[in-house]
Amino acid sequence: MKLRPLIAAAASAVLFSAVAAAPAGAASAPPPTLAGVLDAQGGRPDHNWYDFDLLAAGVDAAGLSEALDDPAANLTVFLPNDRAFQALVADLYGPLYWFADEATILSQLVRLETSAPGTLRTVILYHAVSGQIDSKTALSVPSGTPLTTLQGGTVRVSPVAWLGTAVLTDADRNDVDPWLVPSKLDIRASNGIAHGISFVLRPADL
């Protein structure tokens, strides 16, 4: 019988016509810039302590949104989550802030910037380095590998490969050093790459 070849031919014709009719713009959209990544991962203060609302607000307050939106940039950015900023504020202003909501933590970050203008910019630039460092590289470098940040200070990377993370040693010897959050690695952008981290990197000993 010739029914099976006819069905196959008809199916091929339908497939070919569908492909031919697909619009040229149907290709996958390019990834967003680092600013777009941060906008997508953050927003207004909410009840989720493990996104990046407070960092997004800090970037805006520090006037760094355009730098992260620059298509010519080529950066690795470490993203402290909201809980990381809560820990920073509690360390600066007292342990009662462990019971505060995100909006209150944000108000204290604004207070910090008001009392010492440029502080947020300094801190945020300490979280960015030139070039793209993916998690595979971060987990394979020698322990204590230095990275020079855009702020000018140094962060040292020490892999803990069996846990799928790395510790980032900052300039504050008395705090808990942040580590890469395994579920927030290799967030791709058109102008760089980002990794979530557990605490805020500190460019000075607080």
Give names to the regions the model predicted.
Residues 3-9, 16-18, 22-206:
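Mature, structured domains of secreted/extracytosolic soluble proteins
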